[in-house]
Amino acid sequence: MRTFVLRARAAPTNSRALLEGVGNEAHTEILAHTLMNTMFVAQSHRQDVVVHLVLESTKDFSRTITIHSNEVSNVGGFHEANLLNIVVRALDASTGMGKEELRNVEPGVTVRTISFERLVQQLAENHQLYMLEKKGEFVRDIKFAANPCFLLTDHIPMPKKTFNSLKRLGTQNISLGPKMLFASQCVTLIQNELDLQE
């Protein structure tokens, strides 16, 4: 199983604000682009991929929307608007949730009121964590673990305190090259490296 976590620090947990953020300061389109490039290939979709989108611009709790590629069925078409609608439906389903609650949204999609830090702690129990870092080990020099989990962020960098927490969880820093890339570009390169190692 390949797992990806996108920490979307600027993404609102209000569905209307999320849609208004497309192409604006929040850059919520990154959610759709990352979903597209983690879960789909030409004329098909990838098996055994899990994507966690952690939306953090909120008045109450972060929302973690989880999509399982093997189970998701209600995409409705391969374009940005339909992929964002998955996120919108999950946010609407999360209205009124308390801390660390879980709701099923539709086949293959759940929403939880759980923070990035708590999610990563849970994932570290049965995944090898990899964090993209410019000074990390070059991706081509790494033999990936059997159950990898890749941690990415939107255009707002991770807080410095997060790096210490991730280090304690055994996170390995990896680099995709000298240029800073969009999260949606990173996942394409990571998927390709994993494909080559299979």
Swiss-Prot record:
GO molecular function, one term: S-adenosylmethionine-dependent methyltransferase activity
Localization, UniProt: Cytoplasm
Positions bound to S-adenosyl-L-methionine: L132, C186
S-S pairs: none
One GO CC annotation: cytoplasm
Enzyme class, first EC level, given as a word: transferase
Record keywords, A-Z: Cytoplasm, Methyltransferase, S-adenosyl-L-methionine, Transferase
Methyltransferase found in the keyword field: yes
InterPro entries, A to Z: Alpha/beta_knot_MTases (IPR029028), TrmY (IPR007158), tRNA_m1G_MTases_N (IPR029026)
Keyword Transferase: yes
Its EC number(s): 2.1.1.-
Gene Ontology BP terms: tRNA methylation
Major localization listed first in the record, in broad terms: cytoplasm
Family: Belongs to the methyltransferase superfamily. TrmY family.
PANTHER family attached to this UniProt entry: TRNA (PSEUDOURIDINE(54)-N(1))-METHYLTRANSFERASE
Protein name per its UniProtKB record: Putative pseudouridine methyltransferase
Native species: Vibrio vulnificus (strain CMCP6)
High-level lineage: Bacteria, Pseudomonadati, Pseudomonadota, Gammaproteobacteria, Vibrionales
